[in-house]
A protein has these predicted regions:
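Conserved C-terminal "lid"/linker of ANL adenylate-forming enzymes
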Residues: 215-218, 250-317
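Ser/Thr-glycine-rich phosphate-binding loops at phosphate-binding pockets of nucleotides
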Residues: 108-112, 168, 192-193, 277-279
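Gly/Ser/Thr-rich phosphate-binding loop
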Residues: 12, 16-20, 51-55, 59, ...
Length: 317
């Protein structure tokens, strides 16, 4: 209940609907420390309380989907699982549907009273965060989403204008049917050495849907190719198996967004180590700084490999 989303979506909406609210302890859900999750404990908790609805982060959804794909039985009481707080790949939504999980992706921000958009039964589009709710109006300017309507009063000690649209900092577009699509954060967008814009969240969401990768941060600013710093679900995974996993992910990406190589993280990214925010998002600069030597070594290792311009010069010769 420390987040506005859980208060608005999990508490207030349920109370207004005359629903029962269950708030298990973190231990009962299966959490341990800042990043540990015991999935069987989580599933046992779901069976014990048989909820009809819950709000999940993409990482929790992936854990449930992977468990179900391996034969774990999930409760049939679930009717609406809202997922948000990070980019959710279309493949993960499809996998959730295939194992019978009623997942609906949404989008929001605290400045705009939490939930802004939501897919709903009968109004769902894969790859989108749904249509805006009645209290919000969403527009796009220079690729960035702006929101008008009900909003917060401001931050303590910080004057915030209550007039005009809120610049979300999120990149995206609205399709012809009014569904909003998010591609990443403006401040995280990087430009490769060949002038291609890449939203790292998009590439990371593809990596994290593969069972080999537990955490990943993609880097390619002013570089000839992209790399990812990743913590593997099995840190002992061999190089050949890791290469095969990366190749499988890259097949779903255009050439400019593909990841050339993986830098193995030296430890799980955690809030306690300063590598995650309080809501579980990666602190990119801190992760890059911690692995700077390994990143430079990775780029140096591939420095002699031909790249696009090398092939172009060979063709012209």
């Amino acid at each position: 209940l420390s987040t506005l989303l859980e208060n608005v979506g999990g508490l207030y909406a349920a109370l207004l609907s005359d629903a029962e609210i269950v708030v298990p302890s973190l231990g009962e859900i299966g959490y341990s420390g800042s990043a540990g999750l015991d999935v069987p404990t989580l599933i046992a908790c779901l069976h014990r309380h048989r909820p009809e609805s819950a709000i999940l982060l993409p990482q929790l959804l992936l854990a449930l989907v992977m468990a179900a794909e391996r034969g774990a039985a999930l409760p049939d009481s679930l009717k609406f699982l809202a997922v948000g707080g990070g980019r959710v790949g279309e493949t993960l939504i499809a996998r959730a549907g295939a194992v019978g999980l009623p997942v609906f992706e949404g989008y929001g921000l605290s400045e705009c009273a939490s939930v802004v958009c939501l897919n709903r039964p009968g109004a769902t589009r894969a790859g989108s965060v749904g249509r805006p709710l009645q209290h919000a109006r969403v527009s796009v300017r220079d690729g960035e989403l702006f929101v008008e309507g009900v909003r917060m009063l401001g931050y303590l000690g910080d004057e915030v204008s209550r007039h005009g649209p809120v610049a979300t900092g999120d990149l995206g577009h609205i399709d012809d049917d009014g569904f909003v699509h998010i591609t990443g954060r403006r401040k995280h967008l990087f430009i490769t050495a060949f002038g291609r814009n890449v939203s790292p969240e998009w590439v990371e969401s593809e990596l994290l849907q593969h069972p080999a990768f537990a955490q990943a941060v993609v880097h390619g600013e002013a570089r000839p190719f992209n790399i990812a710093i990743a913590w593997l679900r099995d840190p002992a995974l061999g190089d050949e198996a890791l290469r095969a996993a990366l190749d499988a992910v890259n097949r779903a990406l255009p050439d400019y967004a593909r990841v050339r190589d993986i830098v193995r993280a030296d430890a799980l990214f955690t809030f306690a180590d300063g590598l995650l925010t309080s809501n579980g998002r990666p602190r990119r600069d801190a992760i890059l700084a911690r692995h700077a030597d390994a990143v430079e070594a990775c780029y140096a290792r591939h420095a002699s490999e031909p790249i696009f311009f090398d092939h172009l010069q060979e063709s012209a010769a």
